[in-house]
């Protein structure tokens, strides 16, 4: 809470507005197509939900035949293990529900932002929610990994390894 208030005061000292974070002051940024309603707008919510949860990797006619979009793709394609957050039960239900509230609030804030991330694979801003999703998954996880979990974790590992290889050691990004 203290850091949030300090940030708002800092904004006021710099820009004479508590809610001005300086993004709109970057030359040309408001001319970018993803900011056609300003930096933050409820108009962006449907697109951002699609980017975060559904946007698939791209199929191509030549190698790499399957590749993540370099500006954004669904977290469910790069890390399907996060689906285990929806498992029922919890060791500490209050903690689990509090984390879900945090994820919901953070997602709303992320979804009203015009840009889905930038040059990366997956949904860049999902990392903001991951600590809470990990707590949720830990709260409702079984004592032993199930075969389905092994598959999901293995797929997530391979997908991220493949995308990292594409981005860093191939001509895909050049």
Please annotate each region the language model reported:
Residues 1-174:
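Membrane-proximal envelope and lipid/glycan-remodeling enzymes
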């Amino acid at each position: 809470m203290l850091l949030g208030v300090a940030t708002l005061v800092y904004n006021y000292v710099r820009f004479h507005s508590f809610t001005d974070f300086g993004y709109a002051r970057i030359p040309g940024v408001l001319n970018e197509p993803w900011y056609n309603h300003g930096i933050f707008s409820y108009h962006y919510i449907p697109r951002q939900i699609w980017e975060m949860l559904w946007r698939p990797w791209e199929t191509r006619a030549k190698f790499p035949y399957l590749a993540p979009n370099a500006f954004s793709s669904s977290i469910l394609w790069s890390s399907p293990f996060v689906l285990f957050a929806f498992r029922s039960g919890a060791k500490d239900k209050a903690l689990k529900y509090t984390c879900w509230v945090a994820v919901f609030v953070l997602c709303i804030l992320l979804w009203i932002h015009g840009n889905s991330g930038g040059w990366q694979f997956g949904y860049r801003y999902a990392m903001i929610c991951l600590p809470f999703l990990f707590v949720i998954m830990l709260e409702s996880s079984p004592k032993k990994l199930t075969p389905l979990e092994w598959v999901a974790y293995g797929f997530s590992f391979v997908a991220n390894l493949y995308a990292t290889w594409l981005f860093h050691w191939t001509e895909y990004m050049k």
